[in-house]
């Protein structure tokens, strides 16, 4: 019926030909791996703070979900009004400073602190996600978008296993040495 047929580049071709996207994808992989590492650590910290209460551990996931929901419409408007690249950088720096502050002060031994850190990290992520999604069409051509979205989505899925696996390895190694 006369529709336009777009041909998408392959994954490696896109990463080689679009350096801006390749940098974004690489930084997203680091971000996603760190996120999943942190999520698993938050589950374990909630368990440690409560003698492994399943309710407290599930609370981390609930806090993440219930924090994202009301924030994303607001942060989506931010992504429409301000430079997306800078919002992404600010969001990551905010999350880094918050995480390091909590770690260095050693206050993650109670459930309230674990939940507070979870909320603050989600705030950073709620700023980053809509900005990143809106930024993608500005650095990729229409033909590249299908492949770019597939790489971003696949990277997120792969990072879940990598980040959680690394966290499990590091945490079990640390706990094993303390025992």
Outline where the language-model segments fall.
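Short secondary-structure boundary/capping segments
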Residues: 12-14, 105, 127
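Helix-breaking motifs and short loop linkers at transmembrane-helix boundaries and internal kinks
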Residues: 51, 83, 105-109
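Transmembrane alpha-helix termini and helix-breaking/packing motifs in multi-pass membrane transporters
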Residues: 41-49, 103-105, 162-179
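Short loop-to-helix capping motifs
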Residues: 18-19, 52-53, 110, 176
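Substrate-agnostic recognition of the 12-TM MFS/MFS-like secondary transporter fold
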Residues: 22-39, 60-79, 83-98, 113-172
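Extracellular/periplasmic helix-loop-helix junction of adjacent transmembrane segments
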Residues: 41-66
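Juxtamembrane intracellular "pre-TM" segments in multi-pass secondary transporters
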Residues: 2-22
């Amino acid at each position: 019926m006369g529709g336009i047929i777009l041909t998408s580049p392959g994954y490696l071709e896109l990463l080689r030909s679009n350096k801006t996207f390749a940098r974004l994808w690489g930084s997203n992989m680091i971000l996603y791996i760190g996120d999943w590492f942190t999520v698993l650590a938050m589950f374990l910290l909630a368990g440690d703070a409560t003698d492994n209460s399943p309710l407290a551990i599930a609370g981390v996931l609930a806090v993440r979900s219930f924090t994202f929901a009301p924030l994303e419409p607001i942060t989506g408007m931010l992504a429409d009004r301000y430079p997306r690249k800078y919002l992404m950088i600010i969001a990551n720096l905010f999350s880094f400073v918050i995480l390091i502050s909590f770690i260095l002060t050693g206050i993650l031994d109670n459930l309230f602190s674990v939940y507070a850190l979870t909320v603050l990290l989600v705030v950073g992520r709620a700023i980053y996600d809509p900005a990143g999604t809106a930024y993608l069409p500005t650095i990729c051509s229409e033909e590249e978008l299908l492949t770019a979205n597939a790489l971003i989505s696949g990277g997120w899925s792969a990072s879940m296993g990598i980040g959680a696996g690394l966290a499990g390895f590091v945490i079990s190694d640390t706990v094993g040495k303390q025992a």
